[in-house]
Amino acid sequence: MSTRSVSSSSYRRMFGGSGTSSRPSSNRSYVTTSTRTYSLGSALRPSTSRSLYSSSPGGAYVTRSSAVRLRSSMPGVRLLQDSVDFSLADAINTEFKNTRTNEKVELQELNDRFANYIDKVRFLEQQNKILLAELEQLKGQGKSRLGDLYEEEMRELRRQVDQLTNDKARVEVERDNLAEDIMRLREKLQEEMLQREEAESTLQSFRQDVDNASLARLDLERKVESLQEEIAFLKKLHDEEIQELQAQIQEQHVQIDVDVSKPDLTAALRDVRQQYESVAAKNLQEAEEWYKSKFADLSEAANRNNDALRQAKQESNEYRRQVQSLTCEVDALKGTNESLERQMREMEENFALEAANYQDTIGRLQDEIQNMKEEMARHLREYQDLLNVKMALDIEIATYRKLLEGEESRISLPLPNFSSLNLRETNLESLPLVDTHSKRTLLIKTVETRDGQVINETSQHHDDLE
């Protein structure tokens, strides 16, 4: 039938294929119109209707619908909108009844199809609501959540970077202080080593002096021994001379007794002996004094050298202990410096690794933000496509509603199950009066839309008489 061909062809243009599938279009809207007129007579049937569309730069679509070919055996008879003249019922033949029956079937099919359209529109509206809710959720929660996470992560990264920077500065200050301490200790070590060398050289000179003093003491001891031997020899010689002199004196005394006239030799010998004894005593005293003075000088020099040697040994031991303690301290400072440098290198490596990880995290978050933006854009495009489909469906439903209302007003008969469609309110479009002459009417209707709004609508009629 013609109405079925109109609805089927327009549905295929809208959704493609059967009536259960849909194909959204983002840039096109479709408008289909159909006019149906009837002529009373032996053959009252609607002519086939075709819908053609073409795109124009202004977004206008032209729908052509051929008018109903009317054949009438009763010219001048018209169907009114409010009532039906039942006096002409006898003139309606069996073909008209069949046509009415077919029209009822077609209207019932249109009713079912409209119900399917309404269900689909409701489903699409629900999908639109779901998408709008998701879009609002993405706009609200997604942005705030990602922004908060990003800001929190950036604050944590900045805090860690500041902490690592402070730790690095503190470690560098400690390293500089330790380097200064090491330089100061090295200088002190050099000074101590110089003092040690000076002390060792002084000790070496003292040792040479001690050796010289020892040699001098040995020489003096030998001289003392030789002098003592000489003194003993002189004493022995003196005693022998005294004995000889005493013997001579005794002999002379005897001679004196015999010869009184001889001179007094005893007094002369006594004088000589006294002179020799005084000379010997003087020499012995001088030798003892010289020996004592020399021994005292040597003892004093030895004691002085021993004190200097002992002091030098004590200083050497003290310097050795200081050198050992400083060496241990330098080794400890070297170990501490090495450990600090190793810790600093590890901290720098960890800092570089954490910075790289944070950069990766920032890149990943930026990628997620970009993906969310792309997903939001995709949802917006899908929502726009669904809005375009819904608008096209609304236009087609309005067109079918106008057709049905025109048919209802023409035949002035209630349609079965038509109240269950819950159609939206639209303005009724009155059908033009059709002459009973046999003619073909070509209706060209141009509808211009922009952003889903109808901005211009024109119609042109072309009549071709048969």
Curated annotation (Swiss-Prot):
Residues 132-153 are annotated as: Linker 1. Residues 154-245 are annotated as: Coil 1B. The keyword Glycoprotein applies. There is a cross-link at K445 (Glycyl lysine isopeptide (Lys-Gly) (interchain with G-Cter in SUMO1)). InterPro entries: IF_conserved, IF_rod_dom, Intermed_filament_DNA-bd, Intermediate_filament. The modification Phosphothreonine is found at T20, T426, T436, T446, T458. Residues 96-131 are annotated as: Coil 1A. There is a cross-link at K104, K120, K129, K139, K223, K262, K294, K313, K373, K439, K445 (Glycyl lysine isopeptide (Lys-Gly) (interchain with G-Cter in SUMO2)). GO terms for biological process: astrocyte development; Bergmann glial cell differentiation; cellular response to fibroblast growth factor stimulus; cellular response to lipopolysaccharide; cellular response to muramyl dipeptide; cellular response to type II interferon; decidualization; fat cell differentiation. Residues 96-131, 154-245, 303-407 form a coiled coil. The modification N-acetylserine is found at S2. The modification Phosphotyrosine is found at Y53, Y61, Y117. The keyword Ion transport does not apply. Residues 1-33 are annotated as: Disordered. One of the most prominent phosphoproteins in various cells of mesenchymal origin. Phosphorylation is enhanced during cell division, at which time vimentin filaments are significantly reorganized. Phosphorylation by PKN1 inhibits the formation of filaments. Filament disassembly during mitosis is promoted by phosphorylation at Ser-55 as well as by nestin. Phosphorylated at Ser-56 by CDK5 during neutrophil secretion in the cytoplasm. Phosphorylated by STK33. Phosphorylated on tyrosine residues by SRMS. S-nitrosylation is induced by interferon-gamma and oxidatively-modified low-densitity lipoprotein (LDL(ox)) possibly implicating the iNOS-S100A8/9 transnitrosylase complex. Glycans are attached at S7, T33, S34. GO terms for cellular component: axon; cell body; cell leading edge; cell projection; cytoplasm; cytoskeleton; cytosol; intermediate filament. GO terms for molecular function: double-stranded RNA binding; identical protein binding; keratin filament binding; kinase binding; molecular adaptor activity; protein domain specific binding; protein phosphatase 2A binding; protein tyrosine kinase binding. Homomer assembled from elementary dimers. Identified in complexes that contain VIM, EZR, AHNAK, BFSP1, BFSP2, ANK2, PLEC, PRX and spectrin. Interacts with BCAS3. Interacts with LGSN. Interacts with SYNM. Interacts (via rod region) with PLEC (via CH 1 domain). Interacts with STK33. Interacts with LARP6. Interacts with RAB8B. Interacts with TOR1A; the interaction associates TOR1A with the cytoskeleton. Interacts with TOR1AIP1. Interacts with TOR1AIP1. Interacts with DIAPH1. Interacts with EPPK1; interaction is dependent of higher-order structure of intermediate filament. This is Vimentin.
